[in-house]
């Protein structure tokens, strides 16, 4: 790893320029303010959306939904933090209007993903709580907690999605974070119920513990809405192995179970987390130094696709989960996995084409940089922080100074307003790069952790 870092010396800024990062966040925030569409005291944005046409989902332009991932709740979260950090009433006003839209339209979310974090009501409620705190608006905080409680205590019956993106695995750590803040017992009770759902839906084989996330999702929604290459997956289809990775795979679910086990002292949750991490470990390709993309894998065939580097699928999300696992357990195996993820991601960053890469949190440079920012917070590692500054400086040089649109995480859409795929997420990255202690990660939302002693190196 050190050799890779030395090769980056010629493109690495000498130090993080916090003022320019705030300027970049301000510029993105100002663009969102100018493009907001108002209706009374709430607002929305036009952006890329997928609409059904002739039996398939095609990219179109339309108003955004209410969710955290790609809707008004996510934009509100960014603008709320930005308004607080800059003490700017204009950003605060639009943050309030955006979260007002999200709260009003939460009822429109499809049933299959309604109770999740990134796509559902728990995420909207969480954003309302955070925006309310930024704006010192106790009414918003109360409304946020009420929505989280409604979603957390809903009767999921047979419609429980299980992954981090839309299901119980994403909700559990958020409930635990809110429990740590408030001490409200219903939050822990709801987290335990969600944990029981995860254990009940798990599959065990010689590799470890895993979940048929795509099959579960196919039973609740048309997967072509996520990707055309997933359109042929049906509920109960066992022709593909269960996924690894963070947003839809075993690693993200393992992280949720580990957080629950640590908070509740339930050994069965901790044991299940260990077995789920073991499943993910079993797929690691040591010869090629990668985790494969099992979305592209059919049973009986070799995995030949390059290993992905992203939060949603790949080394970034896997690394974030292992960093947190190391923090909770002090197990050096998890540290080793985190180092592997750092190595792969650094290699991708330094060998890639930053001018054409997108700056999304989900599967872009902003998300890649979060892996190094989290590691720097955890260990005090200066090299990791330097890579964050490299990514940030590239964006300022290639996009801001060249007056280009920020590349989004949606193919065919040069710019998008949302949090995980677009402008709000890019702005969030710059705000967090400038104020990492004050701005929490939105890619690993769970109970707070304390940094390890400064100077802990990797590689």
Residue ranges, per PLM feature:
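Glycan-recognition and catalytic cores of secretory/periplasmic carbohydrate-active enzymes
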Residues: 1-459
